[in-house]
Curated annotation (Swiss-Prot):
Signal peptide: none annotated. This is Maturase K. Usually encoded in the trnK tRNA gene intron. Probably assists in splicing its own and other chloroplast group II introns. One of its GO terms (molecular function) is RNA binding. It is found in: Plastid, Chloroplast. Belongs to the intron maturase 2 family. MatK subfamily. GO terms for biological process: mRNA processing; RNA splicing; tRNA processing. HAMAP family: MatK. Coiled coil: none annotated. InterPro entries: Domain_X (IPR024937), Maturase_MatK (IPR002866), Maturase_MatK_N (IPR024942). GO terms for cellular component: chloroplast. Keywords: Chloroplast, mRNA processing, Plastid, RNA-binding, tRNA processing.
Length: 517
């Protein structure tokens, strides 16, 4: 850790003094052959593989400077496919050197280098993304997921068409290498990265089939891939049109992102980032002035542009050509869905999002008369996908296919308080997350399933009946928590089903809502 701290301090010092030393050309290769970096990487690999950890005192017996240089030279000179075949053959062999078994073969070195590459990328990218983090801190950004809906209600309701676009993830490995060559210009490091990305072809695919050992690298490459896409897109807009950013980049779930970028602590399971980027600006091509609104959530983004449907179709072809030219990959047209805001609905962050007309009556008082008129405006309509929620509860073994509650047999080994807290936590998070929906009363069907599933789980554990469980626990099953009292204090005179609640302290997605995406 001393080496990492020294390198980061040195890089910051060079940036402050504005010297002519290109730090990305000097430090990346040096980090690959640092003993402390190797010790951290080997300890990570040993923790995952169940092997014994390596101390710094015993490090020279395992990894010498000459061995590292020789291995990196072999990677640079040989074909990576031949190297991978050799590592597979060497994995099954054991060499003996005296009385000690020589178990750390090429495969062991390869996995260690993979961990080292992840560490180096975290160090280098953390320094490069510090200006971006400072920009987020200067902006009036919100950490809440629900802050996106007031923004969409203010701006998207005036747009006739929306483009719902899914970002392609099947990128050629050499495209990823080209991205990093722009930032890290030393030759040995991209060769080491090339060896890894060629072994795992779909390394940035958004799928749970990715091995757990490369999830951290997959997350890092995905975030950098999205960063390159958005920075290229915005810079192109600024060069082509007079693009002036009005409200730039509201970053949600900022705490988790900073922990991931600055490498504050090691996370055992890293999931895909749930950043939501909001970008709006004015575009002035020739003499016609219009506005563009861009919202990205996970692997999807929505573009709203004023004008006719013909204009949004031109933007569709623009994104197809943009992806082919800058990323050298075929952007399949079915990934772009053109939706009318007044008719079509789209899935969005576990909700069903749409717009509906709303009639507002206005009274205008004249001198001796009272005129009553009305006008129609669009209103954001957020609906809970109840049927999808029931399907997910069925998948999680809370109910059967017909929606009847069943016992959660996997939780019967827990304590009674733990079972009650688990069910109460699920219901509390669902209530918070869907508090701004119009059909919030449909959540009582979900509450019914969870309530009886909790009772049946306790009855199955104690080998009794539900009647005995009701009599024993009573109101402890789903007690009236503080989030009920909060609504009663604010809406004491108004029925809370008629008002939408957006909780601006909700900074992470619940796992069921994440599955609905």
């Amino acid at each position: 850790m001393r080496t990492m701290a020294w390198v980061l301090a040195r890089i910051n010092k060079l940036q402050i003094h504005r010297t002519n030393i290109f730090w990305q050309q000097r430090f990346s290769y040096l980090l690959l052959i640092q003993d402390d970096i190797y010790a951290i990487a080997c300890n990570r690999f040993s923790k995952k593989s169940g092997l014994k950890k390596i101390d710094n005192s015993n490090l020279n017996n395992r990894f010498s400077f000459i061995t590292k240089r020789r291995l990196i030279s072999e990677i640079r000179q040989q074909n990576q496919y031949f190297f991978l075949e050799t590592s597979e053959r060497m994995r099954k062999k054991r060499f003996r050197q005296g009385n000690q078994s020589f178990c750390y073969c090429i495969n062991y070195y390869f996995r260690s280098i993979r961990e080292i590459v992840i560490l180096v990328l975290q160090i280098v990218l953390s320094v490069q993304l510090q200006p971006l983090l400072r920009e987020f801190n200067e902006c009036n950004s919100s950490q809440s997921i629900h802050s996106i809906f007031p923004f969409m209600e203010d701006h998207f309701s005036h747009r006739h068409c929306l483009a719902d676009i899914k970002i392609p993830y099947s990128v050629h490995p050499e495209i990823l290498i080209r991205f990093f060559r722009r930032r890290i210009q030393d030759a040995p490091f991209p060769h080491s990265l090339r060896l890894i990305v060629h072994e795992y072809k779909n390394i940035i695919v958004l799928d749970e089939s990715i091995p757990l050992e490369i999830k951290k690298l997959s997350t890092l490459l995905w975030n950098y891939y999205i960063h390159e896409f958005e920075s290229t897109l915005v810079s192109l807009w600024k060069k082509t049109w007079c693009f002036v950013t009005l409200y730039h980049k509201a970053l949600l779930d900022r705490t988790q992102s900073i922990q991931k970028i600055e490498h504050i602590k090691e996370q055992s399971h890293v999931t895909k980032s749930s950043w939501i980027i909001i970008l709006s600006g004015s575009i002035v091509p020739c003499t016609k002035k219009d506005s563009l609104y861009y919202v990205r959530y996970g692997s999807n983004f929505i573009v709203a542009v004023g004008g006719t449907k013909f204009l949004i179709h031109k933007w569709k072809y623009y994104f197809i050509i943009f992806w082919q030219y800058y990323f050298h990959s075929w952007f399949r047209p079915y990934r772009i869905c053109i939706r009318k805001s007044s008719k079509d609905c789209l899935p969005f962050l576990g909700y069903i999002l749409g717009f509906r007309p709303r009639i507002i009556v206005v009274q205008a008082r004249v001198i001796n008369d009272l005129l009553i008129t009305s006008f129609i405006m669009k209103e954001l309509c957020v609906i809970i996908p109840v049927f999808r929620l029931i399907q997910l509860l069925t998948k999680e073994k809370f109910c059967n296919t017909s929606g009847r509650p069943i016992s959660k047999s996997a939780w019967t080994t827990f304590q009674d308080d733990d079972i009650l807290n688990q069910f109460n936590h699920i219901w509390k998070n669902l209530f918070y997350y869907y508090s701004g929906c119009l059909n919030r009363s449909d959540l009582y069907q979900i509450q019914y399933i969870l309530r009886f599933s909790c009772a049946k789980t306790l009855a199955c554990k104690h080998k009794s009946t539900i009647r005995v469980v009701w009599k024993k626990y009573g109101s402890r099953l789903f007690p009236r928590s503080s989030f009920y009292k909060k609504q009663e204090l604010i809406l004491s005179n108004v029925h809370f089903h008629k008002r939408r609640f957006w909780y601006l302290d909700l900074i992470q997605m619940y796992f069921i809502a994440d599955l609905l995406r």
